[in-house]
Regions:
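Charged docking surfaces used in two-component/phosphorelay signaling
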Residues: 18-26
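Acidic, metal-coordinating helix/loop segments flanking the phosphotransfer/catalytic sites
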Residues: 33-52
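Receiver (REC) domain active-site loop signature in two-component systems and cognate sites
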Residues: 59
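Short, glycine/charged-rich "phosphate-handling" switch motifs in NTP-dependent
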Residues: 103
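C-terminal output helix
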Residues: 110-120, 131
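CheY-like receiver
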Residues: 124-145
């Protein structure tokens, strides 16, 4: 049996962290949680990186956009899969997320099955496939303007 995927859930809302932890743990993930982008960046500065990050956009101190930008600018985490999760479902926000380098996008409230499916979908792609998918999503959203 292979080791479970490691997920880092980053959200300032305790109920969302708890729900995501419960759902992902039941799906076989090993879950770590952070209450802010700042806390997530501290966790990600260590040697034991997760396989994927579920990242909220609206958080105090360091928001999801800034966290994603810092992750993509760091050689250690530049290719770490990141799925953005936000109540902001506006096309401009979605385009911003893809442009900054997210690998997936979930709206809140998220569908429990959809959360697990999206993380598995992103994890199934290698780095080149994720970058290609990002470019395609950006082009689709730009055309839809």
């Amino acid at each position: 049996m292979s080791a479970p995927f490691k997920a880092l859930v980053v959200d300032d809302a305790p109920d969302i962290r708890l729900l995501a932890d419960l759902v992902l743990s039941m799906a076989g993930f090993s879950v770590t949680a952070a209450a802010s982008g700042k806390e997530a960046l501290q966790l990600l500065s260590g040697d034991d990186l997760p396989d994927i990050v579920l990242l909220d956009v609206q958080m105090p101190e360091v928001d999801g956009w800034e966290t994603l930008t810092l992750l993509r600018g760091d050689g250690r985490t530049a290719d770490l899969p990141v799925v953005m999760c936000t109540v902001k479902g506006l096309r401009e926000d979605t385009l911003k997320g893809w442009s900054l380098g997210c690998d997936g996008y979930l709206g809140k409230p998220f569908d429990i099955g959809g959360l697990v499916d999206e993380l598995h979908r992103v994890l199934a792609r290698d780095g080149d496939q994720r970058r290609a998918h990002r470019r395609i999503r950006i082009a689709e959203l730009a055309r839809a303007r």
